């Protein structure tokens, strides 16, 4: 069965079971107690961006794989040695190391696929 990863995310549990979960705003507006059940394992999600990310985020428990499907973005990584900018255009990917704050500047409407462990994710305004 086909699914739209912008509207339906996939959660891969520690035991290898993949479960479809409502995506988009429905996912992110869940109460924190509900979100907790997705903290273990890996979340696969797709996002469409027309403007810069409104926040920085950091995943303390695992690296994140961020894959640009289309468009143009510059991913900013706040590394101990200073800000690193990674330009992605058309297609490309970046691995964001665990514990590294990151955001993206959007140069053209873009779609990105993200694979990460959500537990403990922190956010702050951009």
Residue ranges and their predicted role:
Residues 1-13, 18-21, 103-126:
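Double-stranded beta-helix
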Residues 1-56:
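A short, N-terminal "cap"/entry segment at the start of jelly-roll beta-barrel domains
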Residues 51-65, 81-82:
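A short beta-loop-beta micro-motif enriched in histidine and acidic residues
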Residues 54, 71-77, 93-94:
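Short beta-strand segments in beta-sandwich/barrel cores
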Residues 60-75, 115:
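Short, conserved beta-strand element in jelly-roll/cupin
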Residues 61, 100, 108:
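A generic "binding-loop/recognition-motif" signal
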Residues 80-98:
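Short acidic-glycine-tyrosine-enriched beta hairpin
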């Amino acid at each position: 069965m086909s699914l739209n990863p912008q509207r339906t995310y996939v959660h891969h549990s520690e035991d290898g079971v993949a479960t479809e979960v409502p995506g988009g705003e429905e996912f992110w507006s869940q109460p924190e107690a509900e979100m907790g059940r997705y903290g273990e394992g890996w979340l696969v999600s797709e996002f469409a961006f027309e403007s810069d990310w409104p926040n920085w985020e950091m995943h303390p428990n695992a690296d994140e794989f961020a894959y640009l499907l289309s468009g143009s973005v510059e991913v900013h990584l706040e590394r101990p040695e200073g800000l690193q900018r990674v330009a992605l255009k058309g297609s490309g990917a970046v691995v964001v190391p665990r514990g590294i704050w990151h955001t993206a500047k959007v140069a053209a409407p873009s779609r990105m696929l993200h694979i990460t462990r959500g537990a403990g994710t922190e956010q702050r305004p951009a």
